[in-house]
Amino acid sequence: MFDKHVKTFQYGNQTVTLETGEIARQAAAAVKVSMGDTVVLVAVTTNKEVKEGQDFFPLTVDYLERTYAAGKIPGGFFKREGKQSEKEILTSRLIDRPIRPLFPEGFYHDIQIVAMVVSVDPEIDSDIPAMLGASAALVLSGVPFAGPIGAARVGYINGVYVLNPTKAELAKSQLDLVVAGTSKAVLMVESEAKILPEDVMLGAVVYGHDQMQVAINAINEFADEVNPELWDWKAPETNEELVAKVRGIAGETIKEAFKIRQKQARSAKLDEAWSAVKEALITEETDTLAANEIKGIFKHLEADVVRSQILDGQPRIDGRDTRTVRPLNIQTGVLPRTHGSALFTRGETQALAVATLGTSRDEQIIDALSGEYTDRFMLHYNFPPYSTGEVGRMGAPKRREIGHGRLAKRALLAVLPKPEDFSYTMRVVSEITESNGSSSMASVCGGCLSLLSAGVPLKAHVAGIAMGLILEGNKFAVLTDILGDEDHLGDMDFKVAGTTEGVTALQMDIKIQGITKEIMQIALAQAKEARLHILDQMKAAVAGPQELSAHAPRLFTMKINQDKIREVIGKGGETIRAITAETGTEINIAEDGTITIAATTQEAGDAAKKRIEQITAEVEVGKVYEGTVVKILDNNVGAIVSVMPGKDGLVHISQIAHERVRNVGDYLQVGQVVNVKALEVDDRGRVRLSIKALLDAPAREENAAE
């Protein structure tokens, strides 16, 4: 019934198994990948017919996590999985990025990849199995795909690279890097690091690429065994006559456009060139396919002009050489009521970054397959359409915005203070107000500045820079601080963030094969030069953390014995609610007895802290207290005196005065304030007090007689 094929190989410390022919047989190809107890089912479906008018490659990648994979039932009212989580979106992008450039130009057939996590080992992340499964399934589907690709996670522990580290190993690692590529070239890198030198980062990329050859060879052997039927697809031939016509109509205008340094004016000139082509070559009778072909030729001409100018040593689109960073403008404290803010402008790219400080209650609760955890630092990136001068829909953040925000967050994680040194929850929002290249790296710079503006004691300043590459044969140019057009028309997008001491985040997307280690080395060195230049200007604008904003909450931390937690909370929360209401504070109590008080003023925080100290304080024997009589006991036994909140003691009738007391009421009244001395605290916590001990003893009778 099943034509099942299985391939097993050792990958680092894990055993990987590829299976096909048993599940999802109606898909073009389906592969079940197991790595330890983590299992991912990847299915590829295709459309043999191209949709009418299609002029781009419609690749869709969806990575989905099923809660049953971890033996859990979804929360919420509907008890089923809902919209994609941030982890699902980021992993979908991770699969998409190295695969997309391996499809041939002109291939416009629908391809859908669905990677579904059906079993999860908490120690083994499902992203690497999902990437390997997508690679294998594409090869088995027979589509024109220049793969397979391999993927590897690389850690760096005690100076040694570790292949596919477990979650426990990653906790000790200075690096979390995912690299993907073919047998010949690296195509994608995504990483975060704890301020590592460039040579260590590059070494990790090379190490990961070397190690993934095992996976690539295994997928090739797997495909040879399955022997899939390959598509009979041929790339459309270039219509040289049509190319010549388009070049004749628009070639010179395109060249003129790319000499204009201002983005909007340049776009207007390119629109003028395209209008001339449309008017001359596209009529009402022209079918959509032919119109798309003409549009594609026009786009190729744009790319050829920009690329040839740069490789010939001419100035770039905006007049810069290959190593110059655009002019910078840095302002902080631009929004008066926010906790911290910065406006970071680099040429025609601008980010308004705003930092907000909160308490532990503001931490993000993340219900992951591996278990629930909280996150004290959030960075959200917004890319409104007006940032590029366009009209567009506003709505939920798109995959690109989620990815850019995650990259900027990774860049800043290494310099955040420890929770015990700075107990605030931190949120940074980066509003991209202008965009012409590398808005994610502007978010890194702006995010760092806004945190410093908010008074966050960062370990160091962090800056980011985006690099580009143009490669033709043996000629190449590495571009510092790329523009949007250079990003679209170039062969590599290479983003590096870090401090003066090293790299904190590295992201690389390569569109071609042939990027060597030497080219990556040059790009990293050039990026460091630019990063140090930006850091100098950032430090000149903000040398260190500013004073905490008057509008930010003040946090006060104290520690009490765990057995006192119940007293602070009170019956049904009565005591703690009373303290928060009276002082206007917010109080969080951890299980270990750590109390965090959030207040709008120093006075309110001190008042709440004093109340808690009073509740948790112990009565000390021999100490004198000012107390209030709260009750006169029956039968003339004595009186109960409150010496501190929740702490009462007995003043026995014999301890009221030196003389004989016949009636307690003659000496004490409810509400009366008296000074008492603590005589004893017994094993049950009962307190004996004395008023008499503080009174002068009467003179002896013989002394009186004299």
From Swiss-Prot:
GO terms for cellular component: cytosol. The keyword Magnesium applies. One of its GO terms (molecular function) is polyribonucleotide nucleotidyltransferase activity. Its cofactor is Mg(2+). Its main location: cytoplasm. Its EC number is 2.7.7.8. It catalyses: RNA(n+1) + phosphate = RNA(n) + a ribonucleoside 5'-diphosphate. Keywords: Cytoplasm, Magnesium, Metal-binding, Nucleotidyltransferase, RNA-binding, Transferase. Mg(2+) binds at residues 487, 493. One of its GO terms (biological process) is mRNA catabolic process. Belongs to the polyribonucleotide nucleotidyltransferase family. Involved in mRNA degradation. Catalyzes the phosphorolysis of single-stranded polyribonucleotides processively in the 3'- to 5'-direction. This is Polyribonucleotide nucleotidyltransferase. It comes from Neisseria meningitidis serogroup A / serotype 4A (strain DSM 15465 / Z2491).
